Amino acid sequence: DAVRLYMLNSPAVRGEDLRFTEKGLVETTRQQLLPLWNALVFLSTYAKIDGWDPSPVNLSVKNNNPMDRWIVSRLHKLIAEVQNEMDGYDLNRSVAPFVGFIDLLTNWYIRRSRRRFWKAAQGPDKLEAYATLYIVLFEFSKLIAPFIPYISDGIFQTLRHDSDHESVHLELFPEADSTLRDIDLENRMD
């Protein structure tokens, strides 16, 4: 997946020359793949400690927290962007938005929401944080499956229910839901 993402994010996709370096692979792994995997580990670890189960009842929580609404809005913006670029067969421009989303998810959403996960009490805010991070990672795994298939399937396998398909590669590509977009909130957060 590191090689695949490195190459998809390189001039080679546009038919230009590429000077392949191991340093580029290390940077791709360090800046994109490890933070994404660490987001999954973060969710899994704290959900297990708190005994949180991603049952349909627990996932139907309303997003009252602005951070939750923001990351869900950004996810659906991302889905629309990637779908648009893929429809235009522009592979290079399909990858760039989700690479940026990994940074938003890990360096903004999770870092700004950590205290919500660390609370001792199982209040609604904590449950909303779990549900939001779960849904975002689950849907994101479907979005990135064509690009980084192994990590996306690892995320999917960790989060899936028995009623879900056996692999992310058997799932439908996610569709953007414009009703979950909050453009005003996105602009204020940017």
Where are these regions (language model features)?
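Conserved phosphate-binding loops in nucleotide/dinucleotide-binding enzymes
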Residues: 1, 15-31, 64-66, 88, ...
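Catalytic adenosine-cofactor/nucleotide-binding cores of aminoacyl-tRNA synthetases and other
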Residues: 1-62, 160-164
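Non-catalytic, well-ordered alpha-helical scaffold segments
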Residues: 1-5, 26-41, 92-99, 103, ...
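An acidic- and aromatic-residue-enriched active-site/binding cleft used to recognize and process polar
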Residues: 8-12, 23, 91, 99, ...
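Core structural elements
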Residues: 8-10, 31-44, 50, 65-78, ...
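Short, charged/polar, low-complexity loop and linker segments
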Residues: 11-19, 77-89, 120, 175
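Conserved short loop/turn motifs at secondary-structure junctions
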Residues: 21-25, 98-99, 122-129
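Acidic, turn-prone loop/beta-hairpin segments
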Residues: 50-80, 111-190
